[in-house]
Swiss-Prot record:
GO cellular component: nucleus
Zinc finger residue ranges, NR C4-type: 5-25, 42-61
Native species: Caenorhabditis elegans
PROSITE patterns according to UniProt: NR_LBD, NUCLEAR_REC_DBD_1, NUCLEAR_REC_DBD_2
DNA-binding residue intervals: 2-78
SMART domains the UniProt entry points to: HOLI, ZnF_C4
Descriptive protein name: Nuclear hormone receptor family member nhr-106
Keyword Zinc-finger: yes
SUPFAM superfamilies: Glucocorticoid receptor-like (DNA-binding domain), Nuclear receptor ligand-binding domain
Domain NR LBD: 110-380
Amino acid sequence: MQTTCEICEVPAHGIHFGAITCRGCAAFFRRAVNTKTNRKSCKYSSNCTNFTGKFPQCKSCRMRKCIKMGMMPEKVKVMQPISQSLEIFVSRPNLILFTNNYDKTRNYIDVSNLITRGLEILKQGFPTPLGIGKTNLERMASGVEFSTAESKIVDVVTGKSVSMVWEFDFISTAKWLTRLQDFCTLPMRIQMQLLQTIWHVWSRMYKVVKSSELRKKHADSSNLFQVLDQFHVNLGTTKLDVSWLTTYSYEEIKYFLYGIDDDIYLQSAITAASKLELTDVELTYMAAQTCFQYAQNRFAGTEIAEVCAKFQEILANDLHTYYTKDHKRTSNYAGKLSQMLKCVQEIQKSIRTTRERTTIARTFDIYITDFSNPEMFIDSGC
């Protein structure tokens, strides 16, 4: 196979729009086809031959050579107007800011406003009245709504859409944690560190549960996935704009986002959750177990690990109390708990495989995002 670009003769990347070209010429051809402005004619009798970028190139001659070498305009997908994006559905100020670095090769994402909002929630502490006579687990369950009523489908997911999901997940996790009374007695430094550690783990469990409920309500729904309260996507048809994350196309980086089998472990967790008829208390226990076990492993041997082990013990005792309060719940206690823990294990596998793919993407600069608080996005997939 030819190893040089047929247009500018630099090392080729592959076949683009019908010719063997480099990335630069492929991008030029795509822009040229999609542009609405008239192209200026050549000033040098249409005899330009050097398109390596060492001096201003003649776009007219470059386009003419692209056509001559076999590049076909009909193979370029015309940009469609963005419709039904998440920001159309949701109207609220952004707590996450996307900006370009000085060299314009990387995107800087400032989440400091979101951190400040989370800190405000933590400082407010647990809501009052907290629920007299209720266990920690029951109080945490009352703070999360897993209903998928009136869920709408989103056709396009953009960077702004992703930031809205992050905001919802981070703030929801902060409110959820404040319903655990022992959490509110921790030093604020540890509270914030735990929040920044587990918010994306809580997010995975939330989306698994919401997606399982959503799929029960729709026929032929194996591709439906809940991303935000009352909004979902179709993994087969919803468009994903990843320009905020990478310079590559979605098709080129899909593996790093979902793996070979569209995150088979997360899909397995959704399937497992769909087979269970879980109450809000049971769902909350499953979420708490996933979050605190993850944090315990991540901070093994530290004070945070000890705190997370204590929380798991408290909530396990609360779950036992919940089952023994009503003899009807104890009929398949062990079997149900086993299925719940299986779901937890699938999510943990999803986190581990995501970590491996993200490490590769970061190592080879496939992802071009830099965060103001990078510790918050460890194992988040970005």
